[in-house]
């Protein structure tokens, strides 16, 4: 239980603030009083065994739990000081500013161009075709994909390799100017070479975005993140600079997890 916030990031601007966040599904509590401050322009990793609550908390950040029957979310959750669970907040607009990248690449059954252009079209971010072209190119460049696909933008996104598809999905998220990018096991379906490219991309993107990644790979958390939060049985057990979590954990449960005593 973390009813006082864990904040090892006092020297960094805070992007996401959670206070006593709870989640239950059909009356069964899945997350217990999570309080945390997550900094901007950095990568924060959520680690822990299966069913520990890390993905449940991640889904709170763009209100994906709203889509689950029987889900009840409590507590306060703000992005840049704005309470995202306020009933006046349109979840569709929220999900544009809080992008989501899932475990399995999920490009739309559209062309590469239309995959990236989809969000800007819906949200009216481009008034002309040249403006839309620029948004698409910029997003693909930021995702490290432009040089690989610039000559075949009309080809299906589903025809790309797994790693390219995942970068296309990241470009799709970037195209609508998000504040936060959520990644739920983004490399679990990829081979080691594609995983390394995604990890390089994450490191590049953190210069401009708040990135939060759920991963079962402690090695990946150590490689890509600046801060790490360890969840266990629906509780946020420990949160701190990644190096401290892995080399000098304060809680014995964290120590036991990272040394492989359970998982």
From Swiss-Prot:
GO CC annotation terms, alphabetical: plasma membrane
Catalytic activities: phosphate(out) + ATP + H2O = ADP + 2 phosphate(in) + H(+)
Keyword Zinc among record annotations: no
A UniProt-annotated Pfam family: ABC_tran
Cell compartments where the protein resides: Cell inner membrane
Bilayer topology term: Peripheral membrane protein
GO MF: ATP binding; ATP hydrolysis activity; ATPase-coupled phosphate ion transmembrane transporter activity
Keyword annotations: ATP-binding, Cell inner membrane, Cell membrane, Membrane, Nucleotide-binding, Phosphate transport, Translocase, Transport
Protein EC: 7.3.2.1
Alphabetized PROSITE patterns for the sequence: ABC_TRANSPORTER_1 (PS00211), ABC_TRANSPORTER_2 (PS50893), PSTB (PS51238)
Subunit description: The complex is composed of two ATP-binding proteins (PstB), two transmembrane proteins (PstC and PstA) and a solute-binding protein (PstS).
Function: Part of the ABC transporter complex PstSACB involved in phosphate import. Responsible for energy coupling to the transport system.
Family named by the database record: Belongs to the ABC transporter superfamily. Phosphate importer (TC 3.A.1.7) family.
NCBIfam families from the UniProt entry: 3a0107s01c2
Protein name: Phosphate import ATP-binding protein PstB
Taxonomy of the source species: Bacteria, Pseudomonadati, Pseudomonadota, Alphaproteobacteria, Maricaulales
């Amino acid at each position: 239980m973390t009813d006082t916030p864990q904040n090892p990031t006092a020297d960094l601007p805070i992007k996401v603030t959670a206070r006593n966040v709870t989640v239950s599904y059909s009356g069964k509590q899945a997350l217990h009083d999570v309080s945390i401050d997550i900094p901007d322009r950095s990568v924060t990793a959520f680690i822990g065994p299966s069913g520990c609550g890390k993905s449940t908390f991640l889904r709170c950040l763009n209100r994906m739990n709203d889509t689950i029957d029987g889900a009840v979310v409590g507590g306060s959750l703000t992005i840049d000081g704005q309470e995202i669970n306020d009933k006046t907040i349109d979840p569709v607009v929220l999900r544009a500013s809080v992008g989501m990248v899932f475990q399995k690449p999920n490009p739309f059954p559209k062309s590469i161009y239309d995959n990236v252009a989809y969000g800007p079209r819906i949200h009216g971010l481009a008034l002309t075709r040249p403006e839309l072209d620029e948004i698409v190119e910029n997003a693909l460049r930021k995702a490290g994909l432009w040089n690989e696909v610039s000559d075949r933008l009309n080809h299906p996104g589903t025809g790309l390799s797994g790693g390219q598809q995942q970068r296309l999905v990241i470009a799709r998220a970037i195209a609508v100017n998000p504040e936060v990018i959520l990644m739920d096991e983004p490399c679990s379906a990829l081979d080691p070479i594609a995983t390394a490219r995604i990890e390089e991309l994450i490191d590049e993107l953190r210069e401009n975005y708040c990135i939060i990644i759920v991963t079962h790979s402690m090695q990946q958390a150590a490689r890509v993140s600046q801060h790490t939060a360890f969840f266990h049985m629906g509780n946020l057990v420990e949160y701190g600079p990644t190096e401290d979590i892995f080399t000098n954990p304060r809680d014995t449960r964290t120590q036991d997890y990272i040394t492989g005593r359970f998982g």
